[in-house]
Amino acid sequence: VAPAFIGRDARELETLVNDVYVYRSNYKYQGTPFWNCVAYLEASLFDMLGRAAGRSVGDLIGGAWRSEIPIYLSSMRRDTTPEEEVRWVGERLAETKAKAVKLKVGGRMRNNEDSVPGRTERLIALARRTWGDGLTLYVDANGSYDHGKAIEIGRQLVAHGYAWFEEPCPFEQYEETK
């Protein structure tokens, strides 16, 4: 995607982003990998424009809304027992003082099974019981479930006060995700 930006006026950012989609038939490569590349270039151009103007990127796009951004701790592990995961994440929480945690659930990409049998259901309850209501909890299933299992897990998450359920069904299955 970079060649579509070379030699062009960075101040015309909206036009550049629109044009890159059709440049050399880039539209054939639509999807996350393509748009991630565009986003990296767009962020770099915003940074360059801000430096040239001696202003923050926030100022360039209408003013900063906050001076601090809350972070969450994200675990990428699925091969642990709930007890191992809560202990490991708890150590990271003590180090980082994060106010939220995102845990991995399911077996990844729709097989309705955990890598450790029963892990998801036990982890959902154990994490909330261990950390209480003062910590915001999220889960990411990476498309682990069909719609029936996703609804079942979603109800457990609601019952335990989780804030979000990321990608319960495979992302390309729009009907099941509804």
What are the roles of these predicted feature ranges?
Residues 14-20, 28-30, 60-61, 96, ...:
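Short hydrophobic/aromatic-rich motifs at helix boundaries and adjacent loops
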Residues 3, 7, 59-63, 67, ...:
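Generic structural "secondary-structure junction" signal
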Residues 1, 16, 37, 41, ...:
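Generic hydrophobic, aliphatic-rich segments that mediate packing or membrane embedding
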Residues 1-52:
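Metal- or metallocofactor-binding catalytic centers and their adjacent structured scaffolds
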Residues 67-178:
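Metal-dependent enolase-superfamily TIM-barrel catalytic cores that perform enediolate-based chemistry
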Residues 36, 42-80:
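Glycine-rich, aromatic-flanked loop segments that form ligand/cofactor-binding clefts
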